[in-house]
Every structure is written in C-alpha cells, then in structure tokens.
Amino acid sequence: ADMLMKTSQLLRYGLDNQKRISSLRNEIEMIGKYIEIQKKRLGKRVRFILEYGDGQEQISNISMPGMILQPLVENALQHGLHDVTENGEVVISVQQQDNVITISVSDNGKGMKPQDLEELILNDYQMKGGTHLGLYNVIRRLEMYFHDQIQISLHSDEGCGFEVFMEIRQNIQ
C-alpha cells in the first residue's frame, strides 16, 4: 500500500509539474519517493545516496521547473546502470554556499567514451536515434528558466560513471 501511495504521488507530481514551476523542496521530496520505489524494484543491485545540504545550513527553496531530478536518476538507471547486478550507486547531491546552489546526479555505471560525450554535447544533448531526450528536455527547461544564472556540465569517462552537474546562482536583492 505504501508503494502504491508513493507511485500515485509521483505520477500526480509528474502530471502537474512537467510544464509548470515547482520548487527545489518539492523536487527533493519527489525524488525521495522515486528512490523508494526504485529500491523495491532493484533490491541491493543499486544503492541510492541523497545528500541534501550539510545539515547546518538551510538550502534556499528556490523556484524551478518541475520534473528535473527524476529524469536524471532514470537516465542513470537506464543508461549507466542497466546491466549492473551489484554495487551500483546513484548519488543525488544538493548543496548551497552563499548564493550558489549546486545540484548533481551521478552514477558509477559504464559511463561514456570521451568522443561519445563530446558528440552528445555538440548535438544539443541528443544522440542519433533520439536517445537522451530526457537529458535534453531537462537541460533546455533549466536554461529557459534560469537563463544565465545556471551552468550545466556533463562529466563521464568509459567505465567511470556519468555526472550531470548544475550550478545555479541566485540573484540576491
């Protein structure tokens, strides 16, 4: 019953927020539910780590497009950790220092060859055959919303996982 409740909450959030504005706090709450569902599905094959601040400082609850974290975690599972039978790991980290919030989603999966990563970036985050559309949509929506306040970088090496790293600078009045 608990999994059914989490699944329905996640679906409702996705339907309500895919084209709307949400908040960082809502994104964190929903990725927590998504992780619980994936833990049941994957068992001990993949470990999830959610790092949210250092416990000392409150992270600003900034407005942001909805459904940002879930597609990135889904990409990690589908592309990086698809064949993993044990010791897979997905780390979602949200930190803040002064007026800069950093968000990263990384995995320890198969990664990408440097030339494939370069091709992904040069082709506007889309691969031939239409793969990585979730990554494309997330990056486009973030760039449209935050404009020059956000920097997004991708890091990967074959056999060494994949990371999407975002740095959001808040305007302080």
Which positions does each model-derived feature cover?
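Two-component histidine phosphotransfer core
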Residues: A1-S153, F162-F165
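C-terminal beta-strand of the catalytic ATP-binding
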Residues: M166-I172
